[in-house]
């Protein structure tokens, strides 16, 4: 092939480009032709195409979205801000990791050249969201550049090779069992809200997954409230183990779980993985011992009340407007046939609401954080929930018919 070149060469000249057939990689070799003969040669191997595929914009956007949240926003390791893309046999594999949580997603696509590349994840996702054409072509070149083509638009993103990207942990030899994805999602949703967001309380920043006697129990707590739910699983009843899953991994499992699909859960001493449909998530476990919560949930409640959930949610939202920002305390006053909620703040005023309840004892007062109580009610599934209390100093126990249990610690009774 002959090309006439300007600019980079001092004088207009011709370049001959040859495919070197002897090379299995079909290297491109460039010879600069002068009047005195071949003055030099350049190996263009670094710019050959190493991957190419075409996929619909919607499917590519959904694919990136599934792995995007795992990518760290800031890290001293540049390749971790990238997503690894591998193409082979009309399949694409997207992988992302922050070295604690890793996720991999597989989809079908039209693959023209098998290969791999890593692309800056957030920039790539932002670009795909702005494109309007139905299909997108992605091609990677060994010169650390990826080309994204959509209709008449063409973009080039700096990329990196696969060799620097961490490998996904191997879970093939891990113990495994299956569980309905919607059930798994529901269990994590109804417990993760209670997890501590304070890094100083390390083990409480994760959700406990405990297995014993053929039952899987999921627990989240921050020390002020606790959420627990369990379900039976198809696993040898003699097996037992406790696994503390980072909240980031739990939130990703909730996102990836879909209806009418079985999830496979893999258990290892230091890792746990969940596979749902075409997505696999692997996470390291938090080290440490989860606090023993059995004394709290086994507390005997001398008073058992039925509460209408929606009505109580509405009343709590109203009276919470009158709480002190430093304490957020609402007084629950139980008298025969009635529950009265009271809050007052010197800078705002006072709120007082009431509802009918099936209480027949003497007047009983206890204070709770209304926002913690609202969280619990929002994660209950029944319209009628049961509240168990004993006095002003012991925790309240809230249950429904779905094998869930919630604990909320009382607050000090006082007037602002």
Swiss-Prot record:
Keywords: Cytoplasm, DNA replication, DNA-binding, DNA-directed DNA polymerase, Nucleotidyltransferase, Transferase. One of its GO terms (cellular component) is cytoplasm. The keyword Transmembrane helix does not apply. One of its GO terms (biological process) is DNA strand elongation involved in DNA replication. It is found in: Cytoplasm. Confers DNA tethering and processivity to DNA polymerases and other proteins. Acts as a clamp, forming a ring around DNA (a reaction catalyzed by the clamp-loading complex) which diffuses in an ATP-independent manner freely and bidirectionally along dsDNA. Initially characterized for its ability to contact the catalytic subunit of DNA polymerase III (Pol III), a complex, multichain enzyme responsible for most of the replicative synthesis in bacteria; Pol III exhibits 3'-5' exonuclease proofreading activity. Belongs to the beta sliding clamp family. Forms a ring-shaped head-to-tail homodimer around DNA which binds and tethers DNA polymerases and other proteins to the DNA. The DNA replisome complex has a single clamp-loading complex (3 tau and 1 each of delta, delta', psi and chi subunits) which binds 3 Pol III cores (1 core on the leading strand and 2 on the lagging strand) each with a beta sliding clamp dimer. Additional proteins in the replisome are other copies of gamma, psi and chi, Ssb, DNA helicase and RNA primase. NCBIfam families: dnan (TIGR00663). This is Beta sliding clamp.
């Amino acid at each position: 092939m002959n090309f006439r070149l300007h600019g980079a060469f001092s004088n207009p000249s011709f370049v001959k480009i040859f495919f070197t057939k002897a090379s299995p990689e079909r290297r491109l070799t460039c010879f600069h032709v002068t009047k005195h003969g071949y003055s030099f040669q350049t190996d263009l191997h670094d710019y050959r195409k190493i991957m190419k595929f075409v996929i619909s914009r919607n499917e590519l956007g959904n694919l990136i979205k599934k792995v995007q949240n795992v990518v760290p926003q800031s890290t001293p390791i540049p390749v971790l801000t990238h997503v690894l893309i591998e193409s082979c046999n009309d399949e694409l594999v997207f992988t992302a990791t922050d070295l604690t949580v890793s996720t991999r997603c597989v989809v079908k696509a039209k693959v023209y050249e098998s290969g791999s590349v890593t692309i800056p994840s957030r920039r790539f996702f932002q670009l795909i969201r702005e494109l309007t054409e139905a299909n997108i072509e992605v091609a990677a070149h060994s010169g650390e550049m990826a080309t994204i083509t959509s209709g008449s638009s063409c973009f080039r993103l700096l990329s990196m090779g696969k060799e620097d990207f961490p490998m996904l942990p191997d879970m093939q030899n891990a113990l495994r069992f299956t569980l309905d994805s919607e059930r798994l999602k529901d269990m994590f949703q109804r417990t993760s809200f209670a997890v501590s967001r304070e890094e100083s309380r390390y083990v409480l920043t994760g959700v406990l997954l405990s297995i014993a006697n053929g039952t899987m129990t999921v627990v989240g707590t921050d020390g002020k409230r606790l959420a627990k739910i369990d379900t039976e699983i198809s696993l040898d009843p003699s097996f037992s183990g406790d696994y503390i899953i980072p909240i980031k991994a739990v939130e990703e499992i909730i996102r990836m779980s879909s209806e009418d699909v079985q999830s496979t859960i893999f258990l290892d001493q230091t890792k746990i993985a969940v596979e749902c449909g075409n997505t696999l998530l692997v996470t390291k476990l938090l080290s440490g011992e989860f606090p023993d919560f059995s004394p709290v949930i086994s507390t005997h409640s001398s008073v058992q009340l039925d509460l209408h959930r929606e009505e109580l949610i509405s009343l709590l939202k109203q009276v919470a407007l009158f709480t002190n920002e430093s304490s957020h305390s609402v007084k629950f006053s139980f008298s025969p046939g009635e529950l009265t909620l009271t809050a007052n703040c010197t800078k705002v005023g006072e709120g007082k609401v009431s509802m009918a309840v099936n209480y027949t004892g003497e007047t009983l007062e206890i204070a709770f954080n209304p926002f913690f109580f609202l969280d619990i009610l929002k994660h209950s599934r029944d319209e009628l929930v049961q509240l168990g209390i004993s006095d002003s100093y012991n925790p309240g126990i809230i249950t429904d018919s779905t094998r869930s249990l919630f604990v909320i610690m009382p607050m000090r009774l006082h007037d602002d």
